[in-house]
């Protein structure tokens, strides 16, 4: 059996982890294992391939279950554990691994992230601490087109978050890497670009300023900050070159071609360890070791053979890496380059060496820019228009000047002399100053791409195949049909009789979108925190991804968990009208008696009263949206006293099909009279799973259910979509109907919401 065939079986067996709605049970896995063993004895190649694929499928499922074990069993109760610190910001965020539990060693260790508290003494990577832990299973917000933090955490082997109740250090010594890093940080303090140097050399990206990260994102050069293929492969190449040069001085019988290869891989492994062996670096080392073994075999391997074997080795070692977007981006980039150089090789023009190198670089960057576009849009929901020019400058500068200088300085830092080390750091710092001067000179190039353009992004692949096969002459009808299929989503227009309500999963806040005919109105804008807000992080990218143009905002009240994203949204769309009960400048009133039409929908305000001096929750703007058949009642954070006053007159006007649960499902709201007078079918609650107030309240939830409401909340369902049409209405949630995946489930204690 060929090794590439085994690689295909590995990839095929583990790939279902990406799409399974839930993991099979133990009995199912036992049956599949037994069935695969039976198939293996059938002397038919295809059947044996199927058996091997089934065994790798079982291996992938067992690996996923192993990661989820911690989240399913360690939550709820207090745990006595020994934690080895793997990374820290030196303040309140600590990454670690639980190596011992209740006095017993566990293998493999479970990843843990602790937030919000200082440890009793100075902390560094490599220390071991005895802790009394209160841990929680990872749970992330889930929105269509948003960052999937739950999937990311599982791919990073970090299924737990939590805090420590008690902590005492067992092993106070820092790891050799941490000591080396601390020494580098002290040495690099005088240099302006020290944070970027540490990011490039040691993979320490926590200290890189947000401004620099934004520049690299906008110019498509953020990939240079990851300690991955570029840095580690260059370290291997440099070490192999030095070893090969040293062989000149050895007797002929001691010279073997394998020695530089093995030495380069060993040096690359040491460098990967020195940088913290982060997942991209670990995957690169597995791929590099696989390539080395293929090279040592003495056979000729094609680019696709190596690609399959490397990807299979990575997935065999770490099956849940299939969830990692960075792995998919790297694998797609390599596949795109193999395809590019096979189907469109660089022209062999007779040019001087320097110009030939420039043409080769332009050819490479053109291929990666065009062919990687579909993956970039799927993962990042946008592209950088300046990435082509930016990478023409950044890749050669960083690859051939900055990184070699940093690697050399890191070596000299251990051996001296000091003056040589200072010179190397200075040159590396100045090369970065030149790089970012060039990047800052470029215009802001990042543009968000709507989902409807996704298929059209495959056009470079399609056109390249059509051109190379001369299909535009031999198969013109097929070429036209392919082009039309890629453009089809752009021609689809919203049905005029349909409109949608989206309840976004913004955590402990509220953000709802009413959409019709490509236009949108926001009811509240989520929350804000010191480093950002829901508008910038979620709502703006979400609107772009769904190709919706907002025309107005309704603010229920002034609390920050409801208006947190407003400033960011107004920065992008400054002409939006705003309605609120706040009497702020440029705000239109939202008080009882106000009514208006928008896209054929009738909006009517039912609270607060005109001239009311109330503030806070009971001053929330309550709005009813009606299409003549179905309606929704948006209530903000209104509480029971205001509910009673609102219902004292005109209570028939608040009847609605759907009700947004007031105040995130708090006991202070959702009085029985309100629930009965609205007489709705569905209750929609927005909250975070781990909130300090344990909302939504189980009493409130049962109160709605006893009155015949279907209960839906964002912790369980994620983003929820209600589609209204002439035929009625239909609800779908991202976590359960639209994108059901095993890694999106509610892990840990079933009733835990605090």
UniProtKB/Swiss-Prot annotation:
This is Uncharacterized protein YcaI. It comes from Escherichia coli (strain K12). It holds the Pfam family Lactamase_B. The keyword Lyase does not apply. Signal peptide: none annotated. GO terms for biological process: establishment of competence for transformation. Keywords: Cell membrane, Membrane, Transmembrane, Transmembrane helix. It comes from the Bacteria. To B.subtilis ComEC, N.gonorrhoeae ComA, and H.influenzae Rec2. One of its GO terms (cellular component) is plasma membrane.
């Amino acid at each position: 059996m060929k090794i590439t065939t085994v690689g295909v079986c590995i990839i095929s067996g583990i790939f279902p982890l990406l799409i399974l709605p839930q993991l099979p049970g133990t009995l199912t896995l036992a049956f599949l294992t037994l069935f695969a063993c039976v198939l293996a004895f059938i002397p038919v190649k295809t059947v044996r391939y199927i058996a091997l694929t089934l065994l790798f499928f079982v291996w992938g499922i067992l690996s996923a279950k192993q990661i989820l074990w911690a989240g399913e069993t360690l939550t709820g109760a207090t745990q006595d554990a020994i934690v080895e610190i793997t990374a820290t910001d030196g303040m309140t965020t600590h990454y670690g691994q639980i190596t011992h539990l209740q006095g017993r060693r566990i293998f493999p260790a479970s990843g843990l992230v602790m937030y919000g508290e200082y440890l009793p003494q100075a902390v560094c990577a490599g220390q071991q601490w005895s802790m009394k832990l209160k841990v929680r299973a990872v749970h992330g917000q889930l929105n269509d087109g948003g960052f999937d933090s739950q999937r990311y955490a599982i791919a990073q082997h970090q299924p737990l978050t939590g805090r420590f109740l008690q902590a005492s250090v067992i092993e106070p010594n820092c790891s050799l890497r941490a000591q080396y890093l601390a020494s580098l940080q002290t040495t690099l303090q005088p240099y302006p670009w020290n944070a970027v140097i540490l990011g490039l050399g040691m993979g320490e990206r926590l200290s890189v300023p947000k401004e620099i990260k934004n520049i690299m994102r906008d110019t498509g050069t953020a990939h240079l900050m990851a300690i991955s293929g570029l840095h580690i492969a260059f370290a291997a190449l440099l070490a192999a070159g030095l070893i090969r040069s040293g062989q000149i001085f050895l007797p002929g019988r001691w010279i073997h071609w394998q020695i530089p290869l093995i030495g380069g891989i060993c040096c690359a492994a040491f460098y990967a360890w020195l940088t913290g062996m982060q997942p991209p670096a670990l995957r690169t080392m597995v791929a590099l070791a696989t390539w080395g073994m293929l090279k040592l075999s003495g056979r000729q391997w094609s680019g696709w053979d190596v690609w399959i074997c490397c990807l299979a080795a990575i997935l065999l070692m770490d099956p849940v890496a299939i969830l990692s977007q960075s792995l998919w981006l790297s694998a797609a980039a390599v596949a795109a380059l193999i395809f590019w150089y096979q189907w469109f090789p660089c022209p062999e023009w007779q040019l001087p060496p320097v110009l030939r190198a420039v043409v080769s670089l332009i050819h490479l960057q053109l291929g990666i820019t065009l062919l990687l576009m579909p993956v970039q849009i799927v993962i990042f929901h946008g592209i950088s228009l300046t990435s082509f020019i930016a990478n023409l400058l950044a890749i050669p500068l960083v690859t051939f000047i900055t990184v070699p200088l940093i690697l050399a300085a890191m070596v000299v830092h251990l051996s001296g002399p000091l003056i040589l080390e200072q010179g190397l750091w200075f040159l590396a710092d100045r090369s970065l100053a030149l790089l970012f001067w060039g990047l800052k000179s470029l215009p802001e190039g990042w543009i968000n791409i709507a989902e409807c353009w996704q298929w059209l992004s495959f056009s470079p692949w399609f056109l390249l195949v059509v051109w190379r096969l001369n299909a535009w002459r031999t198969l013109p009808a097929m070429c036209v049909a392919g082009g039309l299929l890629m453009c089809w989503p752009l021609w689809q227009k919203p049905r005029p009789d349909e409109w949608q309500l989206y309840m976004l999963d913004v955590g402990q806040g509220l953000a709802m979108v009413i959409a019709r005919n490509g236009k949108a109105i926001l009811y509240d804008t989520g929350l804000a925190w010191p480093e950002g807000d829901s508008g910038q992080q979620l709502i703006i990218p979400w609107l772009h991804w769904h190709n919706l143009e907002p025309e107005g905002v309704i603010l229920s009240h002034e609390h920050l968990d409801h208006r947190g994203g407003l400033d960011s949204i107004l920065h992008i769309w400054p002409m939006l009208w705003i309605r609120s009960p706040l009497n702020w400048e440029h705000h239109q009133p939202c008080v009882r008696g106000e009514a208006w039409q928008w896209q054929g929908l009738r909006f009517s305000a039912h609270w607060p009263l005109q001239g009311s001096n109330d503030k806070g929750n009971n001053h929330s703007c309550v709005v009813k949206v009606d299409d003549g058949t179905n309606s929704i009642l948006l209530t903000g954070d209104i509480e029971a006293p205001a509910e009673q006053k609102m219902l004292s007159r005109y209570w028939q006007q608040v009847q609605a099909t759907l009700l947004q649960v007031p105040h995130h499902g708090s006991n202070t709201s959702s009085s029985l009279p309100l629930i009965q007078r609205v007489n709705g079918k569905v209750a929609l609650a927005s909250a975070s799973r781990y909130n300090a107030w344990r909302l939504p309240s189980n009493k409130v939830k049962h109160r709605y259910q006893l009155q015949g409401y279907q209960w839906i909340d964002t912790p369980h369902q994620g983003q929820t979509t209600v589609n209204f049409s002439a035929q009625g209405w239909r609800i779908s949630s991202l976590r359960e109907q639209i994108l059901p995946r095993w890694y999106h489930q509610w892990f840990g204690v079933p009733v835990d919401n605090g």
